[in-house]
Amino acid sequence: MTVYRRNPTAEEAKARDFAAVSMDLIRWFRISERLAALGHDVDLAVPDAASAWPLNPHREAAALPRVALSQVRWHEYDVVKTLFHRGFEVLEEYGGAQHPFIISKLGSVVASRDIDGVHFYGETRRRLYATQQRIRKASRYVTVLSPSARALWTDCFEASDNTLLVPGGVDAVVPAAGADPYPERGKPRVLFAGNIYNEGSQPEANAVLVSKLNQLGRSLGRRGARLYLLGSGDVSRLDPEHVTYLGAVEYRRSWDYMRHADVGVVVVAGTFSHNNESTKIYHYLRVGLPVVSEAGFPNDNVVTESRLGFVVENGDIEGMAAKVIEAAQRAWDRESAIRYILENHTWEKRVDTYAALLTRHFARRMP
C-alpha cells in the first residue's frame, strides 16, 4: 500500500481525477507502478472522494487498485510506503502508523533549527521536524533524495543502515512527440519547468525564484531570447514583460514544451539547496534538451555527466544568460545524453533499491 494525499484539490474534485501536474504525484504514481511491474500487489490509498471517481484508462497509474483511506485494512498489507511528511501524517490520521513495516520517503529533510538551504522556517519547520521524529520511531526504513539529505538525517537522528538513498527520476518511455505548443516562434525559447511555490508552501523560496526568473528573463531579452515558465505556484510578482507564463499542464502534455524549447534552465531558491534535488534536470535531458543550471542543487552533477549543458556560478544571472545563448547555439550530442539518462536515472533504476529491500525481507513470498 502506498500513501500520500489526504484530500483532492478543488480542481481534482471538479475533474474527478488527480491533476498530474506536479512531481509529487508523478513520483507517487511511478514508484507504485514500477513496484507492480515487478510482480508485487500494489494498491493506492486515496482520499475517500477519489475512490468513487469513474475509471479512466488514460489517467496516471490507471491499472493500480485504489482504496479509500477510511477503508484501508492496514494489517492486511506486508508493507506500507508513505510519500513525504504529508504521507506519513495521513497514515497517522487513518490509524496505520503502528504497521510493523513502514517505508517513509522524504523530500526535504529539516533540522531541529532553521538552516541555510532548507526552505522551511519557524513553525513550519518545527512541525515538519516533529513529524520526522515520529517517522524515525515508526518506520522500518527511511529513504531520502540526496547524500546531503542522508547526512542531515544522520546528524539529527544518528547513523542507521535503514536510511536509504532514492533520488528522483524520469520516465523511460515518454509520449510520442506532438505539435508545437508555444504561442509563437522566432526567438530562442528558454524554458523553466517546475513548481515555484506559493504563500502556503515555501513562500521564501517563491520570492527568490520569481526574482531570479525576472532577472534572467530581462537579461535573455537583451540577448534576443525569451524565457517561459511552465508550472504551478504564485506568479503574481512575475514580470510578464520579460517572462511568459504558460500555466500548469498535465504531465503528459509537458513533454512537448520541453521538446520544442531550445534550452531548459534551473535556478536555485537561494545560494544552494541543502538536500532537495532538481527533478527537472532529468526531464530536460530525457528529451535531449540542453540544460543551464545555476549551481547549488545536489544533483547538478547530472548536467556535467550528461555532457549536454552547463552548470554556472550561483547568483551570476548575467553569466547564466550568456551560457543559455551559448547552449542554444552549440551542436550537442543529444542522443548520448538521452542514453545516459536511460542508463542511470529512470524510475526503473530508482525502484531497484525498493526491490532489493523487499527481496531481502520477503524472499519466500516473492512473485
Question: How would you describe each model-predicted region?
Answer:
Residues A15-E33, D171-V174, Y182-R237, G247-Y251:
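Conserved catalytic-core segment of nucleotide-activated headgroup transferases in glycan assembly
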Residues E305-S306, F310-I317, I325-A331:
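Conserved acidic donor-binding segment of nucleotide-sugar-dependent glycosyltransferases
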Residues S22-I26, R30, D180, G315, ...:
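A charged, aromatic-enriched C-terminal amphipathic alpha-helix characteristic of glycosyltransferases
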Residues W74, V109-V110, G122-V142:
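Membrane-proximal helix-turn-helix segments that form the acceptor-binding/catalytic region
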Residues G200-A207, R252-Y257, G264-H283, V292-N301:
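Nucleotide-sugar-dependent
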Residues V79-K81, Y94-I115:
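Active-site proximal beta-strand in glycosyltransferases
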Residues K137-A176:
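Donor nucleotide-sugar binding/catalytic pocket of nucleotide-sugar-dependent glycosyltransferases
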Residues S70-E89, P100-I102:
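Short N-terminal targeting/anchoring amphipathic segment
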